[in-house]
Amino acid sequence: MTEPLILQPAKPADACVIWLHGLGADRYDFLPVAEALQETLLSTRFVLPQAPTRPVTINGGYEMPSWYDIKAMSPARSISLEELETSAKTVTDLIETQQRTGIDTSRIFLAGFSQGGAVVFHTAFKKWEGPLGGVIALSTYAPTFDNDLQLSASQQRIPTLCLHGQYDEVVQNAMGRSAYEHLKGRGVTVTWQEYPMGHEVLPQEIHDIGAWLAERLR
């Protein structure tokens, strides 16, 4: 497996953001974003993992970086749950690696765009047991959230920021909103923010993420 990019901060690291890219992208996709955020988050390490390359059914079996296979797009995503679980294990391993460097998990954040965000949702609220600094979910959905979703006390305490485009044609706004509602209904401190955009990232969005992180790392 390709090793993640690791961006060391200007000061000794006392916090970490693990940031997952989307379908067909790679570990370099959010490198400029991480570099921009580190200009103000001076003691925050960024870890940018790389999804394995695998055939993706909705793209005619074409091989590309993908955290899991997507078998159908509508009305809801049909995915490989086995591959999602494997990717979630990759993320929990990264959390534990950062923990071994001396960073408390209450200062470790999981962020993900699109498919990467779906892995982050599953990891934080279905797999990881323990504190986390927070979750940042960009233009994404939660394929394993349903009405039977049950959260532990520590999972309920994970602050979450959901950001989505009003005109997203890839992951419809309603899909992101559904994940937000699932968490809100279970007592999670979750924030929903919309932007006049499609399936993309805007400078204002990155500014808002930086402010949200800074507030939690004071």
UniProtKB/Swiss-Prot annotation:
Gene3D superfamilies the UniProt entry points to: alpha/beta hydrolase
Catalytic residues of the enzyme = 114 (charge relay system), 168 (charge relay system), 199 (charge relay system)
Report the GO molecular function annotations. Answer: carboxylesterase activity
Q: Which reaction does it catalyse?
A: a carboxylic ester + H2O = an alcohol + a carboxylate + H(+)
Q: Which Pfam families match?
A: Abhydrolase_2 (PF02230)
Could you confirm whether the keyword Disulfide bond appears in this record? no
Question: Which key words are in the record?
Answer: Hydrolase, Serine esterase
EC annotation?
Answer: 3.1.1.1
User: Could you say which protein family the record assigns here?
Assistant: Belongs to the AB hydrolase superfamily. AB hydrolase 2 family.
- What is the documented function of this protein? Hydrolyzes carboxylic ester bonds with relatively broad substrate specificity.
Q: What is this protein called?
A: Carboxylesterase 1
- Protein species of origin: Pseudomonas fluorescens
Q: What is the phylogenetic placement of the source species in the record?
A: Bacteria, Pseudomonadati, Pseudomonadota, Gammaproteobacteria, Pseudomonadales
